[in-house]
């Protein structure tokens, strides 16, 4: 599957994580961002790209920001924004603790300090 624009729900989550991570001009970053779904059983993880040529980078991987929320079925979900060695975000990892598909991204999130 190719890259696409984030949905409104994905955009809301990505913008929250970008703000926590201290990304300069997070709204502009989001406007330029394209995403591609990852094979994760439907939990919602995304590969991130500002240009079609962006590729995940090998080397150091940094967790830039994480939030937690409950899916509409009550199961806890952790969403983490990862960046490569040049601090360019390349992945949104979404982990639903029971590994079931994500039903809905909520409107509020709880920041995970770390």
Feature names for model-found ranges:
Residues 71-114:
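Short, compact, well-ordered microdomains
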């Amino acid at each position: 599957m190719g890259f696409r624009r984030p949905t409104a729900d994905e955009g809301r989550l990505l913008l929250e994580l970008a703000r926590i991570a201290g990304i300069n001009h997070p709204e502009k970053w989001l406007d330029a961002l394209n995403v591609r779904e990852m094979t994760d059983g439907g939990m919602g993880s995304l590969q991130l790209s500002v240009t079609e040529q962006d590729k995940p980078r090998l080397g150091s991987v940094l967790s830039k920001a994480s939030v937690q929320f409950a899916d509409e079925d009550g199961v806890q979900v952790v969403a983490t924004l990862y960046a490569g060695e040049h601090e360019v975000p390349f992945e949104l990892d979404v982990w639903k603790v029971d590994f079931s598909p994500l039903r809905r991204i909520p409107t509020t999130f709880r920041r995970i300090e770390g």
